[in-house]
Amino acid sequence: MEKVPMTANGYAALQVELKQRQTVDRPRIIEHIAEARSHGDLSENAEYHAAKEEQSHNEGRIADLEDKLARADVIDITKLSGDTIMFGATVTLVDEDTEKKAVWQIVGEPEADAKKGRISITSPLARALIGKKKGASVEVMAPGGAKAYEITKVEWREPS
């Protein structure tokens, strides 16, 4: 079983979602199925089929969460330091063409969320950053072509 690196906050968030799906969503869906079943003929009962589909989706997500939690290698990034970029680092980059600044934290795949500034350790950008230090330049292949960035800051903090 391959371990998946994850921050403590990412692990806790997955635990919260799992508990919600098991203790709140699952009983609610079972109730919907029972109610729809009471309406008679199941072959033409759209409400019943929708509830069964929701149940299937929920159970699949529960299995996925349980797998991710079982394989998690929780890394306490508050105990990490230094100026070399690795898992958990929060990195400030400046686009060398546009001078636009961006801040990214390198996290495990299950907790990656670009809208929240968190990129997966397996992403092309993270792979280009790993092992680099403040002041270095990196080139990343993006959908629109190669992009060059300067690393202006490396920090260590839990994702928010």
UniProtKB/Swiss-Prot annotation:
UniProt keywords, alphabetically: Coiled coil, DNA-binding, Transcription, Transcription regulation
Entry GO MF terms: DNA binding; RNA polymerase binding
GO biological process, one term: regulation of DNA-templated transcription elongation
Record bears the keyword Coiled coil: yes
Coiled coil: 49-73
Pfam families: GreA_GreB (PF01272), GreA_GreB_N (PF03449)
Record carries keyword Transcription: yes
PROSITE patterns named in the record: GREAB_1
PANTHER family, per database record: TRANSCRIPTION ELONGATION FACTOR GREA
Function summary: Necessary for efficient RNA polymerase transcription elongation past template-encoded arresting sites. The arresting sites in DNA have the property of trapping a certain fraction of elongating RNA polymerases that pass through, resulting in locked ternary complexes. Cleavage of the nascent transcript by cleavage factors such as GreA or GreB allows the resumption of elongation from the new 3'terminus. GreA releases sequences of 2 to 3 nucleotides.
Matching HAMAP family: GreA_GreB
Family statement: Belongs to the GreA/GreB family.
The protein's name: Transcription elongation factor GreA
Organism this protein belongs to: Rhodopseudomonas palustris (strain BisA53)
Designated gene of the protein: greA
